[in-house]
Structures are given as structure tokens and as C-alpha cells.
Amino acid sequence: STQKAIELAKKYGTSVHILHVSTEDELRLCANNPFPNITAEVCIPHLWFSDKDFEQYRGLLKCNPSVKSEKDKEELRKALMTDKIYSIATDHAPHSFEEKQKKYLDCPSGTTSIQHSFLSMLELYHQNYIDLPTIALKMAFNPSKKFKIKERGELKPGYYADLVIVDLNKETLVKKGDLFYKCKWTTVEGMKFKSSIVYTFVNGNVVYNHGKITEQPKGMLIEYC
């Protein structure tokens, strides 16, 4: 299906953004692409887990598309610093813990990832898969550019101050009691990240401060160019 979408985009000169690339074969289709209107996105679960992890997490790890082999995961990580990957997303799709305990074929697809998505990417930075400017490029600037989001995705005068301040040298242990998800589960529970989130700003307001939500919601309608 990915190959067909790319062929149609080339044939008709239209744009296509391939979501949730999960295999080495899909990466090959995106390699050496002379068409700037054809781009691809990778999600946190496919960068972080492989089919080896199903025995431990079972239905909690079920997502669509499914996580693939260890080799696929490694190739996705290696592609982060190349133009094969245009953007990085969370694919955050929570379901209740009870729903995810059903038999694999009966439980819904989707994992929780948004709270620890940035920490996951910083961990890959520590492992030398990606540098800090590219994390910002592919998690903020490129998505805002692709979807023509007005005054977002950059730190510049006149733009909304949506940003994160991190401590690259302070570890974070993921504990259930620290989760902000209503479903109260995550596949990274018990993991230790080398970095931590210190502050989060939304529209110039501090909404997260050293592990605590500090403000009432400060969201605004997103405008498009």
C-alpha cells in the first residue's frame, strides 16, 4: 500500500505523507526520494519496541501497524538522521487497561506514548541515533510546516511559545503514580530514562513544573496558514 501511494503521488504530482512507517522495506521506498512532496513519518512505539516484546506486554503493545522485527526497529532508528524520515509522531491512542487485557485479537489497537515521547527521543539522543536539533526539527518544525500550522513549531518573534526545558543529566524513573493518563498504564512503566522534563510551556504559560501540572488548561484553537 505504501508503494502504491508513492507511485500515485509521483504519477499525478500530488503530495502524500506516509504515516507510521514500521519496516525496513518502507524505508527503502522513501530513500533517495527526489520528490519533496512525498514524506514519511515514524512513531515512537516502532522506534522503541519490537515483536520480541509481545511476550511481555501482550495486548498492551498491540497497535496499528504492529511493531515489527528487531532489525526493522534498528533500521528505523538509523534512519532518524536521514531524509527518509520527515517527522516523528506519538500515535498516542489510549484504551482502558481492562480493554487491553482481552485476547490479542479482541483487544483494541493503540498504546500510550505522548507523556514519554520526548524522553524516548532524548534517550535515542543519548544512544547516538539522533541529535538535539533534529529532534526539534522532526517533532516540531516539520509537522507544523507540513500541515501549515500558523505561528507554531519555531522559536521566533511573533510565534507562540510552546517549548520544553529539559535536564539531560537527571534520570527519570517511570512510575504508575506519576502518569497523567486517565487509563493509568504505559508500556514504559519501570523504565529509567537518562533525561527529565523540567518545564513545559504552552502558549507562553508554564503548565508543567518539575513533575507537576501547574495551570488550568491554556490551550487555544490551532490556526492554519
Model-predicted segments: where are they?
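C-terminal/domain-terminus segments
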Residues: 26-32, 216-225
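A short acidic, glycine-rich active-site loop
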Residues: 61-73, 108-112, 186-192
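C-terminal cap of metal-dependent C-N hydrolases
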Residues: 103, 160-222
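Short glycine/proline- and charge-enriched loop/turn segments
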Residues: 54-62, 99-107, 179-184
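Histidine/acidic residue-rich metal-binding segments in metalloenzymes
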Residues: 1-88
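Residue-level signal for inorganic ion chemistry
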Residues: 16, 41, 91, 121, ...
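Short, well-ordered beta-strand elements within core beta-sheets of diverse protein domains
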Residues: 15-18, 62-68, 122-127, 147-148, ...
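His/Asp/Glu-enriched, well-ordered alpha-helical/loop segment
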Residues: 1-3, 7-13, 81-88, 93-168
